[in-house]
């Protein structure tokens, strides 16, 4: 197993991307992350994942803090609260990421990639479970002369080489999960052509330096975990445990997104109290038998991952 418990106190985290207002799916995952940590006597760190600062105005980060606090999902450090493990905004961490990126370069594992997204999709390459194209290795073995010629026309992104190796981990919600790095993931991005670091590297570096011992997030990120465990190993960092919660779907089966304004907390706050929203989400995820109003604190004693469904959760018609 690549992931194991970290000794000492449990540290969970909220890691939202502030590209819009929070919706019910975000809130459900945040509630589960908070309950998992608090039921073990742990702490919560709030990290703002605004790697692409242009898409993530600071106003949305401020609003999501207000929304989480209103619901009673209070964090112990991070965000505007600060703490000993800052910066807590990824847009302020480029120098930190650069240091770790250079460690991977020094191992001879990083190479430039000149492929466009359109080219990859046109190649009909297979996709990972999170919808990304499995990279076919087009630029993996370019010669120095070929790289120099391609640079004249286009700035490259950068990928990390992966071996033909299976990685298995025990997910706290979904159970054992195995993927082959080469066949199921492929060489993946570390840095975009514009210099912005990729999600996979940033979250590994941040979770490690913030002392996070438990990562709770949506099941759409399940296939990211093997890539991240690979990076933890290469960088000599301690990996946390993982629990991937089922996604929350609209009554018609659609996946909720920030474009679903009717399911955004901005609109829901006009119709329901914080306790009503928490109670309805707890009911949808099997944490209480009825959608009765409740506080997050009241759910701590009875929380167990065994109660949480393994399949995506479809909101009952009329619940919200």
PLM-predicted stretches and their roles:
Residues 118-257, 264-268, 317-320:
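Active-site cores that bind ATP or allylic diphosphates and position pyrophosphate for catalysis
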